[in-house]
Amino acid sequence: MTNPYNWIEKSLETLHKANWYRSVKTIHSRSGSVVNLKGNLVINFASNDYLGLAGDERLINASIDAIKQYGTGSTGSRLLSGHRPIHRELENAIASFKQTEDAIVFSSGYLANLGTITALVGQRDLILGDEYNHSSLKNGSKLSGATVLDYEHGNLEDLNTKLVNYRRSYRRCLILTDTVFSMDGDICPLPQLLDLAEDFNCMVLVDEAHATGVMGKTGAGCVEHLNCSGRELIQMGTLSKALGSLGGYVAGSFQLVEFLRNRAATWIYTTGLSPGDTAAALTALNIIQAEPQRRQQLWENVGLLKEQLSGFNLFPSETPIICLGLNTPTEALILAQKLQDGGIFAPAIRPPTVPTSRIRFTLMATHQPCHFQRLGAVIR
């Protein structure tokens, strides 16, 4: 009798042959622009901690205080025994920050997308998503049971064509897009997309994971950055990137949030966000609004990185995500290792995560000019 698990080993062999195999890289220090990787100090260009808050003493102390008051875990779902006053404080703060009526906090950003999409649409509905959307948007779409169609990346003509051809055949239509695309660094054309949604009576859910805390006059995200704050849409984001904590949120109308509390399975049937993570995120929101100089420094650092990488094949980017395009996974792995040997941590990103191989640099407000000089010396 054949072993029913033998296929796993063969699949791993295929990954190795294609140079698609992945393994973790262990960091042995606090989050920061310089970290301890395998016993060596390296400059960290791989973190989503855009504002350098994950290692901030104020977040750490807020988390400790919350743990002392409420314990380490929420111990139940929010609808049973897992709700604490600090959860509602955070949700109110997010709603104020995002200029929406209300907000709801999930235990992760991935869960926020899965739960929201599957609550909003079903078998009689249509989902139209940007082909470069995050995995959580794509998997939420599959789980919903709706008909799912991708439109070409950032191509609103293609989106319009699909709306003309298919919208009338479905009860509801949900358009999904990242606002900042995490593996490319570009931004969606949100104002025009919202115009299309209004023309065809569609809902819109935007993923602000890499925009929250970074984009916009106050750091509220691309919705603010693109002057769309007063328009009707659903805003999702994370607490784990610029906010330096863990969790996800959805912000929108009172009715939307009340509906999700009753229909989003990934909120109803999972343990509430831990008190420590909740307190850290709440503290980060306050810091982001009180210290705009962090964002200013981040944008200055974006300019410094682009100076050092002038002449290389950089993807178009208006964000702190800068990608250097390469021809093959092997080239990406070789360059990533060269950088690491020179004290630079910037991992290779390869298929199937992305269509083409690249080195992805993410910037932090806490990077120093000498870090960029070092990068320039190593990469050339």
Swiss-Prot record:
Catalyzes the decarboxylative condensation of pimeloyl-[acyl-carrier protein] and L-alanine to produce 8-amino-7-oxononanoate (AON), [acyl-carrier protein], and carbon dioxide. This is Putative 8-amino-7-oxononanoate synthase. Gene3D superfamilies: Aspartate Aminotransferase, domain 1, Type I PLP-dependent aspartate aminotransferase-like (Major domain). Coiled coil: none annotated. Its EC number is 2.3.1.47. The modification N6-(pyridoxal phosphate)lysine is found at K241. Substrate binds at R22, H134, T353. GO terms for molecular function: 8-amino-7-oxononanoate synthase activity; pyridoxal phosphate binding. NCBIfam families: bioF. Belongs to the class-II pyridoxal-phosphate-dependent aminotransferase family. BioF subfamily. GO terms for biological process: biotin biosynthetic process. Pathway: Cofactor biosynthesis; biotin biosynthesis. Keywords: Biotin biosynthesis, Pyridoxal phosphate, Transferase. It catalyses: 6-carboxyhexanoyl-[ACP] + L-alanine + H(+) = (8S)-8-amino-7-oxononanoate + holo-[ACP] + CO2. It comes from Gloeothece citriformis (strain PCC 7424). Signal peptide: none annotated. Its cofactor is pyridoxal 5'-phosphate. The keyword Zinc-finger does not apply. Pyridoxal 5'-phosphate binds at G109, Y110, S182, D207, E208, A209, H210, T238, L239, S240, K241. The lineage of its organism: Bacteria, Bacillati, Cyanobacteriota, Cyanophyceae, Oscillatoriophycideae. Homodimer.
